[in-house]
Amino acid sequence: MFTIEEAREILRLDGADNDAIIYPLIEAIPPYLEATTGYSPADGDYSPLAITAGQFLLQLWYFGENSDTDKLQRVIDCLLKALAAERGKA
């Protein structure tokens, strides 16, 4: 879904120091989206909504102890509902 460079940009990180932590998070996003919403990309192309949800998930999972996690979780919940609805229309 994201390259390591894109993930670092999303997380606003410089350097490769945390790549060992970031790689598994990147790999976990697509199966998580499919398990929670039934969404899988058409021809490997993710919808803008799925990409946005993935970005927020990456932030939540990486910065799990941040004070804004409740806000992030609410946004993610709304995005996942919308993604499930989008899948239902396809």
Q: What are these regions, as identified by a protein language model?
A:
Residues 1-90:
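Divalent metal-cofactor coordination and adjacent catalytic microenvironments
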